[in-house]
Amino acid sequence: MQWETVIGLEIHAQLSTQSKIFSGSATTFGAEPNTQASLVDLGMPGTLPVLNAEAVRMACKFGLAIDAEIAEKNVFARKNYFYPDLPKGYQTSQMDHPIVGKGHLDITLEDGSTRRIGITRAHLEEDAGKSLHEDFHGMSGIDLNRAGTPLLEIVSEPDIRSAKEAVAYVKAIHALVRYLGICDGNMAEGSLRCDCNVSVRPKGQAEFGTRAEIKNVNSFRFIEKAINHEVQRQIELIEDGGKVVQETRLYDPNKDETRSMRSKEEANDYRYFPCPDLLPVVIEQSFLDEVRASLPELPGQKRERFEREFGLSTYDASVLSASREMADYFEQVNATCGDAKLAANWVMGELSSLLNKEGLDIEQSPVTAEQLGGMILRIKDDTISGKIAKMVFEAMAAGEGSADEIIEKKGLKQVTDSGAIEAMLDEVLAANAEQVEQYRASDEAKRGKMFGFFVGQAMKASKGKANPGQVNQLLKKKLEG
């Protein structure tokens, strides 16, 4: 039997406000445990919450960016459950009146195709604290610094059909919230966390299968692995005559498996009711107009512009627009060198490879955009070849100066004098007279393979400095003359 995977994602984005959603406590990551938890965060008797206006603004920004309707009237609700790191015994969230209604987001897949994923809603809520296990023997500690940190929970429609699509969607959300400046997207620190709702059904069946929810997956790689494992588990279970149970599961990256945590709760298990301490929030059109005017060029808009203005492929444009910093860097390189395709190749190739190897973000690049653009200019005017350019790039990354300084200091200027190249080629051919005879006696197919040998010898003789185009042209003329 052929199976179809059905996936819906719930993404929790920590909003980049300076203070918590209902108190003035700081939201700085990494502070000493329980040093950023106020009486309001702890739910002490007599304390009252005050809504953070900046959190509302950030939620509206997101809603406008996904073309969603922003609710004029917002109501906060209490979600009641017990957990050690939930000091009040309830979480202040939104249920029937979320701030952001239905919207959508277009994602780009690896083959360059695009898919539209529906977004059911996005609502504001407060984060819980954190349980600590490492420093306690036989016990758990509780750090309430995170309690009350503003979250935007983004709930997708069950439109996703594979683990790769799920990763593409999370990457698109990650890029969007960073472009908007509402979340830093740091998954390692828990700023962006993902719950994956996964089910399978026979291909062609309209009715959904029973879903399992995989909680708090915190990396793109783990999202793909967790979903693939859960899909395989469910298919094998059904084909063996079993039934999928609706439950919450946890992904263990060390064992590459999901395991059961608890039975999955329904909304009525949480006994939602309107929060009596918070009045309904009314959002006026003038406020939305102000927020809309502050929106930057969004990732999808930037990708389309890169394709339209610079003639880049959908894939290249998607990679370069994935982060605001990467897009800005690429545009600065292009502004310096005036060749978008060469700029794209170097940013996506050598530069990205260097950053990955050194574990750096683009903002920490040892090669500035102006330096890289200047080096590409030297390729364009034939001062250096592409091969020599890689040596120049490495030297720039090591802090040895600009491209021009390195070329001058190391004597890397390309040989373009046709007379000098011809003399060098004559020496190469004389030293390989036997291969020359074989070449001239061969058919076209063999000649093509042998030609690369002569080019290699010529570039070796010139220490990579001879202009490759001229070498190819003059070599062909001499071999066939």
Curated annotation (Swiss-Prot):
ATP-binding keyword on record: yes
Q: What EC number(s) does its UniProt record assign?
A: 6.3.5.-
Q: What name goes with this protein?
A: Aspartyl/glutamyl-tRNA(Asn/Gln) amidotransferase subunit B
A Pfam entry, by short name: GatB_Yqey
The record, for SMART domains, names: GatB_Yqey (SM00845)
Presence of keyword ATP-binding: yes
Top-rank taxon, per record = Bacteria
**Could you say which enzyme class this protein belongs to?**
ligase
Sorted keywords for this record are: ATP-binding, Ligase, Nucleotide-binding, Protein biosynthesis
The record, for HAMAP family, names: GatB
Q: Which family does it belong to?
A: Belongs to the GatB/GatE family. GatB subfamily.
State a single Gene Ontology molecular function. ATP binding
* Biological processes per GO annotation: glutaminyl-tRNAGln biosynthesis via transamidation; translation
Query: What's its catalytic activity?
Result: L-glutamyl-tRNA(Gln) + L-glutamine + ATP + H2O = L-glutaminyl-tRNA(Gln) + L-glutamate + ADP + phosphate + H(+); L-aspartyl-tRNA(Asn) + L-glutamine + ATP + H2O = L-asparaginyl-tRNA(Asn) + L-glutamate + ADP + phosphate + 2 H(+)
Function recorded in the entry: Allows the formation of correctly charged Asn-tRNA(Asn) or Gln-tRNA(Gln) through the transamidation of misacylated Asp-tRNA(Asn) or Glu-tRNA(Gln) in organisms which lack either or both of asparaginyl-tRNA or glutaminyl-tRNA synthetases. The reaction takes place in the presence of glutamine and ATP through an activated phospho-Asp-tRNA(Asn) or phospho-Glu-tRNA(Gln).
**What quaternary arrangement does the UniProt entry report?**
Heterotrimer of A, B and C subunits.
